[in-house]
């Protein structure tokens, strides 16, 4: 591994966090590191010139061990991962043998106490061998990618700068200060800790901020720089694996993903209820997933034409057509993340409720939603549109956060799932079927759609991969669906201009006549044309 620059010492976590999480950051100085040169003769050679400092920090997969020289802590010489299957053994009172990657090392510590503490770090990792609920349901590669993603400040910034999201959370918490005043709060998936700060603003006595990514160290820095370390304890780890010293009065979290359920963070949110006191509160309290059939020929054609790339029989002299079917399947397995005008929806949305106070984790493993839509307009149904609302049910007021296409846009946007075979449906007909969300170990869902026009043999279905969406949003203003104008848009515009007092300006351009003179039988402008001699 190439060397990298160390900008700061590992940030010290609060005493409470250190006591609660045995894998908290720690370091050992004056360590002499030897490498086993000959296992049979037990011959050792010094791996580095001079003594080293070992920097240990918690990671979602175990403990990251970084080695730097005592007299030059500016560069990381080597980085290892101490995992549950790491082989290690004590050698005497001050030495410890450990097998890391392809290196068999002997670490000689400056004191017996250091050796004992390091041994405890390794043993604590080994105690993680029995998989937690999170580990059982999640592939290691997916978890690693997930926590790495949320460990970047840029990703936290993206969420924090979602004004609707952040301001709604703050208003929900501060507007229900009675639920937080002098209370014990648990912040699940705290990230930067912004919700923990809101809880303190509302008068919380103590906040336990749980964060499994490396963002925990940045959250700790914010806590200390804002002088609230006596209020907020940042605990690195997963809620499924850490221990708290007490029950809490309120759990706060932002666990929603695309289509509400993506990332499977809601299960973690429900799991956290094991620390909630009887009659405790959840912020948010419940979520509503809305589903509606939509018509959008432009979107359908866009995806269809992408797949037609594979229909070429002479691409640089190569026949690609054998892959056309698979290409079509792949493009239509992608949910579309963007926004739209709600007038493309052909019926009132069906609402599926997730009760965060009472639903069980297992309830989210297979979510079967029956559908029945009374069609309001004739047209071609290209698929189903999804969005969600969540409610914060407080003692003083209820606050809603909406991702509806009628609400201000958020970083969740909306999601649409296309049908490879659209269906023509008439106003007054009933469209029935189901949406089945089946959880997978990639922290997402396989989404199966089955639709049927009642009283006919017409049906269509599709299965999509929510883990692999197509991010289509461009920032351009949302356009009204074609054919929604019931009056002349040109006349409407000029009428509005007249109403706004622009008669004089337009009159100058039209011989002193009102532009909307056409409304009184029309205006012949041909007399004003200049004819060449």
Curated annotation (Swiss-Prot):
Record-listed E.C. numbers: 2.1.1.319
GO BP, sorted A to Z: chromatin remodeling; peptidyl-arginine methylation, to asymmetrical-dimethyl arginine; regulation of DNA-templated transcription
Localization annotation: Cytoplasm; Nucleus
Swiss-Prot/TrEMBL catalytic activity: L-arginyl-[protein] + 2 S-adenosyl-L-methionine = N(omega),N(omega)-dimethyl-L-arginyl-[protein] + 2 S-adenosyl-L-homocysteine + 2 H(+)
Amino-acid positions noted as binding S-adenosyl-L-methionine in the UniProt annotation, renumbered to this chain: 156, 165, 189, 211, 240, 268
Gene Ontology CC terms: cytoplasm; nucleus
Keywords assigned: Chromatin regulator, Cytoplasm, Methylation, Methyltransferase, Nucleus, S-adenosyl-L-methionine, Transcription, Transcription regulation, Transferase
Family matches, as SUPFAM superfamilies: S-adenosyl-L-methionine-dependent methyltransferases (SSF53335)
Residues modified as Asymmetric dimethylarginine: 503
Entry keyword Methyltransferase: yes
Coiled coil (UniProt feature): none
Pfam families assigned to the protein according to its UniProt record, in alphabetical order: CARM1, PrmA, PRMT_C
SAM-dependent MTase PRMT-type domain ranges (all copies): 143-452
Modification(s) after translation: The dimethylated protein is the major form.
One GO MF term: histone H3R2 methyltransferase activity
Function recorded in the entry: Methylates (mono- and asymmetric dimethylation) the guanidino nitrogens of arginyl residues in proteins. May methylate histone H3 at 'Arg-17' and activate transcription via chromatin remodeling.
Family the UniProt entry places it in: Belongs to the class I-like SAM-binding methyltransferase superfamily. Protein arginine N-methyltransferase family.
Subunit and interaction comment: Homodimer.
Protein name: Histone-arginine methyltransferase CARMER
């Amino acid at each position: 591994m190439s060397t990298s620059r160390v900008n700061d010492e590992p940030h010290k976590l609060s005493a409470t966090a250190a006591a609660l999480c045995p894998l908290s950051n720690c370091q050992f100085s004056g360590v002499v590191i030897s490498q086993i040169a000959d296992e049979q003769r037990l011959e050792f050679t010094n791996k580095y010139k001079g003594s080293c400092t070992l920097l240990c920090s918690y990671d979602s997969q175990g403990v990251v061990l970084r080695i730097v020289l005592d007299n030059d802590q500016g560069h990381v010489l080597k980085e290892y991962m101490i995992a549950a299957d790491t082989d290690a053994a004590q050698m005497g009172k001050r030495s410890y043998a450990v097998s890391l990657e392809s290196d068999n090392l002997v670490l000689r510590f400056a004191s017996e106490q250091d050796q004992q503490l390091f041994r405890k770090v390794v043993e604590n990792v080994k105690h993680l061998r029995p998989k937690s609920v999170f580990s059982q349901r999640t592939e290691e590669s997916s978890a690693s990618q997930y926590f790495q993603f949320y460990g970047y400040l840029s990703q936290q910034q993206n969420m924090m700068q979602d004004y609707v999201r952040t301001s709604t959370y703050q208003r929900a918490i501060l507007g229900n200060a009675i639920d937080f005043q002098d209370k014990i709060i648990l912040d699940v998936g705290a990230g930067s800790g912004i919700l923990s700060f809101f809880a303190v603003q509302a008068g919380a006595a103590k906040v336990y901020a749980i964060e499994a990514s490396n963002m925990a160290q940045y959250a700790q820095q914010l806590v200390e720089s804002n002088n609230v370390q006596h209020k907020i304890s940042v605990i690195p780890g997963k809620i499924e694996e850490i221990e708290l010293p007490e029950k809490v009065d309120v759990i706060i979290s932002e666990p929603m993903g695309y289509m509400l359920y993506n990332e499977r963070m809601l299960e973690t949110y429900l799991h956290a209820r094991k620390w909630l006191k009887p009659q405790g509160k959840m912020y948010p309290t419940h979520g509503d997933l809305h589903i509606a059939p939509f018509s959008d020929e432009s979107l359908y054609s866009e995806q269809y034409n992408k797949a037609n790339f594979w229909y070429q029989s002479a691409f640089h002299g190569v026949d690609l057509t054998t892959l056309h079917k698979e290409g079509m399947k792949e493009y239509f397995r992608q949910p579309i993340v963007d926004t739209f005008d709600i007038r493309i929806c052909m019926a009132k949305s069906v609402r599926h409720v997730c009760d965060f106070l009472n639903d069980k984790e297992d309830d989210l493993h297979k979510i079967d939603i029956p559908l029945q839509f009374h069609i309001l307009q004739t047209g071609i149904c290209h698929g189903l549109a999804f969005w969600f609302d969540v409610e914060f049910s407080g003692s003083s007021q209820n606050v809603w956060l909406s991702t509806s296409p009628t609400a201000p846009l958020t970083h969740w946007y909306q999601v649409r799932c296309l049908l490879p075979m659209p269906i023509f449906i008439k106003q007054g007909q009933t469209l029935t079927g189901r949406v089945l969300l089946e959880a997978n170990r990639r922290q997402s869902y396989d989404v199966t759609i089955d639709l049927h026009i009642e009283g006919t043999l017409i049906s269509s279905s599709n299965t999509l991969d929510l883990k692999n969406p197509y991010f289509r949003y461009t920032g351009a203003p949302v356009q009204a669906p074609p054919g929604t104008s019931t009056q002349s848009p040109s006349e409407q515009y000029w009428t509005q201009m007249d109403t706004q007092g622009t008669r004089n300006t337009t009159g100058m351009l039209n011989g002193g006549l009102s532009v909307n003179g056409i409304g009184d039988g029309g205006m012949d402008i041909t007399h004003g044309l200049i004819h060449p001699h």
